[in-house]
Protein backbone atom coordinates (compact mmCIF):
# COMPACT_ATOMS: atom_id res chain seq x y z
CA UNK A 1 0.00 0.00 0.00
CA UNK A 2 2.67 2.52 1.01
CA UNK A 3 5.27 3.74 -1.45
CA UNK A 4 8.51 4.72 0.30
CA UNK A 5 10.76 6.23 -2.35
CA UNK A 6 11.20 9.88 -1.42
CA UNK A 7 13.19 12.20 -3.62
CA UNK A 8 16.58 13.01 -2.13
CA UNK A 9 16.89 10.03 0.25
CA UNK A 10 20.47 8.93 0.88
CA UNK A 11 20.81 5.18 0.32
CA UNK A 12 20.84 3.32 3.64
CA UNK A 13 24.04 1.64 4.79
CA UNK A 14 24.30 -1.88 3.37
CA UNK A 15 24.99 -3.12 6.90
CA UNK A 16 21.39 -2.47 7.89
CA UNK A 17 20.23 -5.54 6.02
CA UNK A 18 22.67 -7.65 8.05
CA UNK A 19 21.23 -6.73 11.46
CA UNK A 20 20.52 -9.84 13.50
CA UNK A 21 17.22 -10.41 15.26
CA UNK A 22 18.54 -9.22 18.63
CA UNK A 23 19.76 -5.93 17.16
CA UNK A 24 16.48 -5.43 15.31
CA UNK A 25 14.46 -5.97 18.47
CA UNK A 26 16.55 -3.51 20.47
CA UNK A 27 16.33 -0.97 17.65
CA UNK A 28 12.56 -1.51 17.37
CA UNK A 29 12.15 -0.83 21.10
CA UNK A 30 14.16 2.39 20.85
CA UNK A 31 12.00 3.63 17.97
CA UNK A 32 8.69 2.58 19.50
CA UNK A 33 9.64 4.24 22.79
CA UNK A 34 10.51 7.44 20.90
CA UNK A 35 7.24 7.38 18.94
CA UNK A 36 5.30 6.92 22.18
CA UNK A 37 7.08 9.44 24.41
CA UNK A 38 9.48 11.56 22.37
CA UNK A 39 12.12 10.88 25.03
CA UNK A 40 15.53 9.15 24.80
CA UNK A 41 15.56 5.60 26.16
CA UNK A 42 18.51 3.99 27.96
CA UNK A 43 19.94 0.48 28.01
CA UNK A 44 18.45 -0.35 31.43
CA UNK A 45 14.89 0.29 30.22
CA UNK A 46 15.53 -1.51 26.93
CA UNK A 47 16.80 -4.61 28.77
CA UNK A 48 13.46 -4.73 30.64
CA UNK A 49 11.40 -4.35 27.46
CA UNK A 50 12.99 -6.90 25.13
CA UNK A 51 11.87 -10.54 25.11
CA UNK A 52 15.42 -11.98 24.97
CA UNK A 53 17.11 -11.69 28.40
CA UNK A 54 20.11 -9.36 28.03
CA UNK A 55 22.03 -7.33 30.60
CA UNK A 56 22.13 -3.52 30.26
CA UNK A 57 25.84 -3.87 29.36
CA UNK A 58 25.02 -6.22 26.46
CA UNK A 59 22.27 -3.84 25.31
CA UNK A 60 24.76 -0.95 25.41
CA UNK A 61 27.11 -2.90 23.11
CA UNK A 62 24.31 -3.42 20.58
CA UNK A 63 23.30 0.25 20.87
CA UNK A 64 26.89 1.23 20.12
CA UNK A 65 26.75 -0.84 16.91
CA UNK A 66 23.41 0.77 15.96
CA UNK A 67 24.93 4.20 16.54
CA UNK A 68 27.87 3.38 14.26
CA UNK A 69 25.38 2.40 11.54
CA UNK A 70 23.74 5.83 11.85
CA UNK A 71 20.42 4.46 13.12
CA UNK A 72 20.44 6.07 16.58
CA UNK A 73 22.22 8.95 18.34
CA UNK A 74 22.69 10.45 21.80
CA UNK A 75 20.98 13.85 22.16
CA UNK A 76 23.11 16.34 24.14
CA UNK A 77 24.57 14.60 27.20
CA UNK A 78 21.70 12.15 27.66
CA UNK A 79 22.52 8.55 28.51
CA UNK A 80 19.58 7.48 26.35
CA UNK A 81 19.32 7.20 22.58
CA UNK A 82 16.90 8.44 19.91
CA UNK A 83 16.46 7.22 16.32
CA UNK A 84 18.00 9.29 13.53
CA UNK A 85 16.01 10.15 10.39
CA UNK A 86 17.82 7.28 8.65
CA UNK A 87 16.78 5.05 11.54
CA UNK A 88 13.15 6.11 11.22
CA UNK A 89 13.26 5.44 7.47
CA UNK A 90 14.72 1.96 8.09
CA UNK A 91 12.02 1.29 10.71
CA UNK A 92 9.19 2.40 8.39
CA UNK A 93 10.51 0.46 5.40
CA UNK A 94 11.80 -2.73 7.03
CA UNK A 95 10.42 -3.28 10.53
CA UNK A 96 7.07 -1.55 10.92
CA UNK A 97 3.83 -3.48 10.57
CA UNK A 98 1.09 -1.28 9.12
CA UNK A 99 -2.19 -2.05 10.84
CA UNK A 100 -5.71 -1.91 9.48
CA UNK A 101 -8.09 0.84 10.50
CA UNK A 102 -10.72 -0.08 13.04
CA UNK A 103 -14.31 -0.08 11.86
CA UNK A 104 -15.13 3.02 14.00
CA UNK A 105 -12.21 4.88 12.37
CA UNK A 106 -13.44 3.96 8.88
CA UNK A 107 -16.98 4.98 9.75
CA UNK A 108 -15.75 8.25 11.26
CA UNK A 109 -14.04 9.27 8.01
CA UNK A 110 -16.99 8.16 5.88
CA UNK A 111 -19.56 9.87 8.12
CA UNK A 112 -17.68 13.17 8.11
CA UNK A 113 -17.79 13.23 4.30
CA UNK A 114 -21.37 11.99 4.10
CA UNK A 115 -22.49 14.79 6.42
CA UNK A 116 -21.42 17.38 3.86
CA UNK A 117 -24.00 16.22 1.35
CA UNK A 118 -23.96 16.57 -2.40
CA UNK A 119 -25.27 20.14 -2.25
CA UNK A 120 -21.96 21.35 -0.87
CA UNK A 121 -18.82 22.09 -2.88
CA UNK A 122 -15.90 19.73 -3.38
CA UNK A 123 -13.81 22.13 -1.29
CA UNK A 124 -16.28 21.85 1.59
CA UNK A 125 -16.13 18.05 1.42
CA UNK A 126 -12.32 18.10 1.35
CA UNK A 127 -12.32 20.47 4.31
CA UNK A 128 -14.48 18.00 6.25
CA UNK A 129 -12.17 15.12 5.29
CA UNK A 130 -9.19 17.11 6.56
CA UNK A 131 -10.94 18.00 9.81
CA UNK A 132 -11.56 14.31 10.52
CA UNK A 133 -8.07 13.23 9.39
CA UNK A 134 -6.48 15.91 11.53
CA UNK A 135 -8.55 14.85 14.55
CA UNK A 136 -7.74 11.16 14.17
CA UNK A 137 -4.00 11.63 13.59
CA UNK A 138 -3.46 14.60 15.96
CA UNK A 139 -1.41 16.29 13.24
CA UNK A 140 -1.99 19.01 10.65
CA UNK A 141 -3.93 17.73 7.63
CA UNK A 142 -3.38 19.19 4.16
CA UNK A 143 -4.95 18.90 0.74
CA UNK A 144 -3.86 20.18 -2.66
CA UNK A 145 -6.75 20.55 -5.08
CA UNK A 146 -7.68 22.31 -8.29
CA UNK A 147 -9.17 25.76 -7.78
CA UNK A 148 -12.85 25.88 -8.54
CA UNK A 149 -14.63 28.54 -10.58
CA UNK A 150 -17.02 29.29 -7.74
CA UNK A 151 -19.28 32.31 -8.16
CA UNK A 152 -18.83 35.19 -5.76
CA UNK A 153 -21.39 36.25 -3.20
CA UNK A 154 -19.86 38.93 -0.98
CA UNK A 155 -16.71 40.94 -0.25
CA UNK A 156 -15.69 42.78 2.88
CA UNK A 157 -12.70 44.85 3.96
CA UNK A 158 -11.66 44.46 7.61
CA UNK A 159 -9.07 46.91 8.93
CA UNK A 160 -6.20 45.18 10.74
CA UNK A 161 -3.87 48.14 11.25
CA UNK A 162 -3.89 51.78 10.03
CA UNK A 163 -2.28 50.72 6.73
CA UNK A 164 -3.33 47.06 6.46
CA UNK A 165 -6.71 45.44 5.84
CA UNK A 166 -8.04 41.92 5.34
CA UNK A 167 -10.01 41.32 2.13
CA UNK A 168 -12.63 38.62 2.78
CA UNK A 169 -14.14 36.99 -0.33
CA UNK A 170 -17.14 34.71 0.13
CA UNK A 171 -18.40 32.53 -2.74
CA UNK A 172 -21.90 31.17 -3.30
CA UNK A 173 -20.83 27.65 -2.32
CA UNK A 174 -19.53 28.80 1.07
CA UNK A 175 -15.80 29.09 0.33
CA UNK A 176 -14.03 31.91 2.15
CA UNK A 177 -10.75 33.36 0.89
CA UNK A 178 -8.71 35.91 2.85
CA UNK A 179 -6.02 38.23 1.49
CA UNK A 180 -4.01 40.86 3.40
CA UNK A 181 -4.02 44.22 1.65
CA UNK A 182 -1.63 47.17 2.12
CA UNK A 183 -3.55 50.45 2.28
CA UNK A 184 -2.40 53.90 1.25
CA UNK A 185 -1.71 56.26 4.14
CA UNK A 186 -4.77 58.01 5.54
CA UNK A 187 -7.50 55.70 4.19
CA UNK A 188 -10.57 56.27 6.41
CA UNK A 189 -13.05 53.54 7.40
CA UNK A 190 -15.65 55.25 5.21
CA UNK A 191 -13.51 54.49 2.13
CA UNK A 192 -13.41 50.78 3.06
CA UNK A 193 -17.20 50.73 3.42
CA UNK A 194 -17.70 52.60 0.13
CA UNK A 195 -15.30 50.23 -1.65
CA UNK A 196 -17.17 47.20 -0.24
CA UNK A 197 -20.52 48.60 -1.42
CA UNK A 198 -19.15 49.40 -4.90
CA UNK A 199 -17.71 45.89 -5.28
CA UNK A 200 -20.69 44.01 -3.84
CA UNK A 201 -23.01 45.73 -6.30
CA UNK A 202 -20.99 44.29 -9.19
CA UNK A 203 -19.48 40.93 -8.23
CA UNK A 204 -22.45 38.83 -7.09
CA UNK A 205 -22.94 35.73 -9.25
CA UNK A 206 -19.70 36.23 -11.19
CA UNK A 207 -16.55 34.12 -11.14
CA UNK A 208 -13.35 35.80 -9.96
CA UNK A 209 -12.14 36.26 -13.55
CA UNK A 210 -15.50 37.71 -14.67
CA UNK A 211 -15.64 40.01 -11.65
CA UNK A 212 -12.13 41.32 -12.31
CA UNK A 213 -12.98 42.30 -15.90
CA UNK A 214 -16.29 43.87 -14.86
CA UNK A 215 -14.67 45.89 -12.07
CA UNK A 216 -11.82 47.20 -14.20
CA UNK A 217 -14.38 48.46 -16.72
CA UNK A 218 -16.70 49.88 -14.04
CA UNK A 219 -13.83 51.60 -12.25
CA UNK A 220 -12.75 53.43 -15.40
CA UNK A 221 -16.34 54.58 -16.02
CA UNK A 222 -17.28 55.58 -12.46
CA UNK A 223 -14.17 57.42 -11.30
CA UNK A 224 -16.09 60.68 -10.99
CA UNK A 225 -18.42 59.12 -8.40
CA UNK A 226 -15.62 57.76 -6.18
CA UNK A 227 -13.06 59.69 -4.19
CA UNK A 228 -9.39 58.90 -4.85
CA UNK A 229 -8.80 56.89 -1.68
CA UNK A 230 -11.79 54.63 -2.41
CA UNK A 231 -10.51 54.13 -5.96
CA UNK A 232 -7.14 53.07 -4.54
CA UNK A 233 -8.79 50.57 -2.18
CA UNK A 234 -10.79 49.04 -5.05
CA UNK A 235 -7.74 48.86 -7.33
CA UNK A 236 -5.66 47.27 -4.57
CA UNK A 237 -8.45 44.77 -3.88
CA UNK A 238 -8.58 43.72 -7.53
CA UNK A 239 -4.77 43.41 -7.60
CA UNK A 240 -4.82 41.18 -4.51
CA UNK A 241 -7.14 38.74 -6.31
CA UNK A 242 -4.85 38.75 -9.34
CA UNK A 243 -1.97 37.64 -7.12
CA UNK A 244 -3.16 34.04 -7.19
CA UNK A 245 -4.88 34.12 -10.55
CA UNK A 246 -2.13 32.23 -12.37
CA UNK A 247 -2.07 29.37 -9.86
CA UNK A 248 -4.66 26.74 -10.73
CA UNK A 249 -4.17 24.85 -7.45
CA UNK A 250 -5.11 25.70 -3.89
CA UNK A 251 -3.83 24.49 -0.54
CA UNK A 252 -6.15 23.80 2.41
CA UNK A 253 -4.69 23.17 5.89
CA UNK A 254 -6.55 22.04 9.01
CA UNK A 255 -5.41 21.21 12.55
CA UNK A 256 -2.47 23.55 13.22
CA UNK A 257 -3.38 23.46 16.92
CA UNK A 258 -2.73 19.70 17.11
CA UNK A 259 0.97 20.40 16.60
CA UNK A 260 1.05 22.33 19.88
CA UNK A 261 -0.01 19.30 21.91
CA UNK A 262 2.42 17.06 23.76
CA UNK A 263 5.40 19.42 23.58
CA UNK A 264 8.22 18.13 25.78
CA UNK A 265 10.73 20.95 25.68
CA UNK A 266 11.58 24.37 24.30
CA UNK A 267 13.28 22.56 21.41
CA UNK A 268 9.90 21.03 20.51
CA UNK A 269 8.25 24.46 20.62
CA UNK A 270 10.93 25.88 18.35
CA UNK A 271 10.44 23.03 15.86
CA UNK A 272 6.68 23.65 15.80
CA UNK A 273 7.27 27.38 15.25
CA UNK A 274 9.51 26.53 12.30
CA UNK A 275 6.86 24.14 10.96
CA UNK A 276 4.22 26.88 11.15
CA UNK A 277 6.59 29.09 9.14
CA UNK A 278 7.01 26.27 6.60
CA UNK A 279 3.24 25.85 6.26
CA UNK A 280 2.93 29.57 5.54
CA UNK A 281 5.32 29.05 2.60
CA UNK A 282 2.43 27.82 0.50
CA UNK A 283 4.39 27.56 -2.75
CA UNK A 284 6.83 25.14 -1.10
CA UNK A 285 4.03 23.00 0.32
CA UNK A 286 2.23 22.95 -3.03
CA UNK A 287 5.43 21.83 -4.77
CA UNK A 288 5.97 19.09 -2.18
CA UNK A 289 2.42 17.75 -2.43
CA UNK A 290 2.62 17.97 -6.21
CA UNK A 291 5.30 15.25 -6.14
CA UNK A 292 2.65 12.72 -5.11
CA UNK A 293 0.35 13.54 -8.04
CA UNK A 294 2.29 11.16 -10.28
CA UNK A 295 2.65 8.40 -7.68
CA UNK A 296 0.50 5.45 -6.75
CA UNK A 297 -0.38 4.96 -3.10
CA UNK A 298 1.03 6.64 -0.03
CA UNK A 299 4.33 8.55 -0.05
CA UNK A 300 6.31 9.23 3.11
CA UNK A 301 8.93 11.95 3.59
CA UNK A 302 10.82 11.91 6.91
CA UNK A 303 12.57 15.05 8.15
CA UNK A 304 15.25 16.36 5.81
CA UNK A 305 14.27 13.92 3.03
CA UNK A 306 12.14 16.91 2.07
CA UNK A 307 14.06 20.20 2.07
CA UNK A 308 10.99 22.27 2.97
CA UNK A 309 10.70 20.73 6.44
CA UNK A 310 14.41 20.06 7.07
CA UNK A 311 14.68 22.70 9.82
CA UNK A 312 11.51 21.77 11.67
CA UNK A 313 12.23 18.03 11.53
CA UNK A 314 8.75 17.17 10.30
CA UNK A 315 7.34 14.20 8.43
CA UNK A 316 4.79 14.20 5.63
CA UNK A 317 2.50 11.29 4.71
CA UNK A 318 0.51 11.95 1.54
CA UNK A 319 -1.59 10.11 -1.05
CA UNK A 320 -3.23 11.16 -4.33
CA UNK A 321 -6.99 11.02 -4.95
CA UNK A 322 -8.85 10.68 -8.26
CA UNK A 323 -12.00 11.84 -10.01
CA UNK A 324 -14.70 9.67 -11.60
CA UNK A 325 -12.58 9.10 -14.70
CA UNK A 326 -9.68 7.80 -12.62
CA UNK A 327 -7.52 10.90 -13.20
CA UNK A 328 -5.47 12.10 -10.22
CA UNK A 329 -6.89 15.52 -9.33
CA UNK A 330 -5.32 16.23 -5.94
CA UNK A 331 -3.28 15.08 -2.96
CA UNK A 332 -4.15 14.85 0.73
CA UNK A 333 -2.26 13.85 3.83
CA UNK A 334 -0.81 14.92 7.15
CA UNK A 335 2.22 16.90 8.31
CA UNK A 336 3.53 16.47 11.83
CA UNK A 337 6.57 15.73 13.97
CA UNK A 338 8.90 12.90 12.94
CA UNK A 339 7.47 10.85 15.81
CA UNK A 340 4.13 10.40 14.08
CA UNK A 341 2.46 7.06 14.70
CA UNK A 342 3.34 5.87 11.18
CA UNK A 343 1.69 2.46 11.50
CA UNK A 344 -1.62 4.15 12.30
CA UNK A 345 -1.39 7.30 10.15
CA UNK A 346 -0.38 5.60 6.87
CA UNK A 347 -3.59 3.53 6.56
CA UNK A 348 -5.68 6.55 7.61
CA UNK A 349 -4.24 8.72 4.83
CA UNK A 350 -4.64 5.88 2.34
CA UNK A 351 -8.26 5.27 3.34
CA UNK A 352 -9.17 8.99 3.35
CA UNK A 353 -7.78 9.32 -0.20
CA UNK A 354 -9.83 6.30 -1.32
CA UNK A 355 -13.04 7.66 0.25
CA UNK A 356 -12.53 11.08 -1.38
CA UNK A 357 -11.92 9.35 -4.73
CA UNK A 358 -15.16 7.38 -4.33
CA UNK A 359 -17.04 10.57 -3.47
CA UNK A 360 -15.70 12.39 -6.54
CA UNK A 361 -16.49 9.36 -8.68
CA UNK A 362 -20.15 9.62 -7.75
From Swiss-Prot:
It comes from Rhodopseudomonas palustris (strain BisB18). Disulfide bonds: none annotated. Keywords: Repressor, Stress response, Transcription, Transcription regulation. Belongs to the HrcA family. InterPro entries: GAF-like_dom_sf, HrcA, HrcA_C, WH-like_DNA-bd_sf, WH_DNA-bd_sf, WHTH_transcript_rep_HrcA_IDD. One of its GO terms (molecular function) is DNA binding. One of its GO terms (biological process) is negative regulation of DNA-templated transcription. HAMAP family: HrcA (MF_00081). This is Heat-inducible transcription repressor HrcA. Negative regulator of class I heat shock genes (grpE-dnaK-dnaJ and groELS operons). Prevents heat-shock induction of these operons.
